[in-house]
């Protein structure tokens, strides 16, 4: 068994990058001080250049990778160790995909997967943040969150794939995405986090992350308390936002990436009808995870 991928998974605009920042400082620094460039230590699964492999296997399929029926056949193959450039142990891999089976092809499996952290966020705030990131109206952003068929394009890295062919990640609706990662048969170590705890209960949450890796994956950290103290300070939202302002951030597709990062933005931004659309659709899951 390989178990070389540790997934950092979330619905878009739910705190994935913040968790990757914490992980990067925890695993890839001596002192726990985070810098934006350290995010290179975690990769994204859904990058177009990965798909060059498909061309070597089946040219006909290669030019149909904008069809999920074709793309899903290669999900697990693309995740195999020799294709992920993970030399030893496991690597951290970002994804916004749902953990689903499409056309009898599961997104991932327990052979490739060492474990995962899943981050969820109040869908009302996700709707606000996604609208800014994707340059959508609030109504269109809410339609994205509530649609079972929602997809986003793979990251536009240099590849042999013609630009008109646009592979997509199957995201689905917010509740289906949450369900797929929080209630499944993927028998691997898993930690479910709330974005709001990452921001407003940070010390406890970072300690939870450290405990998870120590107990579930038997990893020991040197200078643990010093690292935790520095991670708390250096991954402060305003500190990371300042780094983006000074140095830029490659993942910012539309303006700035680190915009506000606060909870309950929806109270000022969304009207009653928009709030009702989200609450009526997601009421059960919102109650389950404490989003009143």
Please state what every model-predicted region is.
Residues 15-29, 192-219, 231, 239:
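PAPS/PAP-binding and catalytic site of the sulfotransferase fold
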Residues 1-193, 259-264, 268-292:
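PAPS-dependent sulfotransferase catalytic domain
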Residues 86, 110, 225, 250-251:
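A short, structural micro-pattern
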Residues 98, 122, 196-198, 234-237:
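Short, solvent-exposed coil/turn elements at secondary-structure transition points
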Residues 32-33, 218-222, 237-241, 291:
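Charged, solvent-exposed alpha-helical segments that act as regulatory interaction surfaces
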Residues 226-280:
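PAPS-dependent sulfotransferase catalytic core
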Residues 216, 234, 284-288:
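Hydrophobic alpha-helical segments
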Residues 36-39, 220-230:
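Short, glycine/acidic-rich hinge or "gate" loops at secondary-structure transitions
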